[in-house]
Design a protein with these regions (language model features):
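Short acidic, glycine-rich surface-loop motifs adjacent to enzyme active sites
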Residues: 32-42, 65-89
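Short, well-ordered amphipathic alpha-helical segments that serve as non-catalytic structural scaffolds
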Residues: 56-67
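Active-site-adjacent helix-turn-beta-strand microarchitecture at beta-sheet edges
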Residues: 1-55, 93-228
Length: 230
């Protein structure tokens, strides 16, 4: 599902999309909230936003978490966001991102924020500081702010993020997290001067069903990109 709790239609004051989705997995009731950066109105084409309002994600998150806890009573609440991860909340000219939101919420009110937008592999070198040159296949320590884990799997399908949680006595504990490289390669130069690109980790085979599903869309996009516009 497409989820976003903070995108509203100005003319009606109603949300344009589902704010959350509920899932039953392993006997647990899991709520997933969607949130979108309010920078969208600034960086997108304004002609598409004449009747659309992007409200502050952190404020909407508080409302939605409250509503879920009162009405749905999930065992776990996660957030999937497109807001960006900025070290120690230093977002510069960008709208506040995941770190700032986590700090503004009740402690531990989300088990995890699965983010995007800043296109970083969020693997922390130390408190409030990401690794600058993360090497694919090496251990990755996610960020943790105010009792909330924050992860981001870089960009463009380069990684799959995997988080293993243990749920016991009503509490979620992260026991393992890793970024799994999807056939990423590095350049290796040999003593004879020749070089080649080799995989960081063992190759992941293509899934025929997924390729069948996605190829028509890839071809459609390719055809549009080949149209001469000037």
């Amino acid at each position: 599902p497409f989820l976003s709790a903070n995108i509203y239609q100005k003319s009606t004051g109603e949300r344009l999309f589902k704010p959350w989705a509920l899932f039953k997995r392993g006997g647990l009731k899991i709520a997933v909230i969607g949130l979108t950066t309010d920078d969208t109105a600034k960086i997108g084409n304004p002609e598409y936003f004449t009747d659309i309002e992007f409200r502050k994600p952190a404020e909407e998150a508080k409302l939605v978490i409250q509503e879920l806890q009162q009405n749905e009573k999930p065992d776990v609440i996660l957030a999937t966001t497109h807001m960006g991860h900025y070290d120690n909340g230093n977002h510069g000219s960008n709208a506040p991102g995941d770190v700032e939101m986590a700090r503004s919420l009740p402690a531990g009110s989300l088990a995890m924020i699965v983010g995007g937008h800043s296109q970083d592999p969020v693997c922390m070198a130390s408190e409030n500081k990401k690794q600058v040159d993360y090497v694919p296949g090496t251990p990755c320590a996610p960020d943790r702010q105010n009792g909330i884990w924050i992860v981001q799997a870089h960009e463009w399908g380069k990684y799959v993020g995997r988080a293993d949680f243990e749920f016991r006595n009503g509490e979620m504990k992260l026991v393992h997290y890793q970024l799994i490289p999807v056939n990423l390669k590095k350049k290796v130069t040999y003593d004879n001067g020749q070089s080649e690109r080799v995989l960081y980790t063992p190759q992941i085979a293509e899934n025929p069903q997924m390729m069948s599903l996605l190829t028509p869309f890839q071809n459609k996009g390719k055809a549009q990109l080949q149209v001469k516009i000037g």
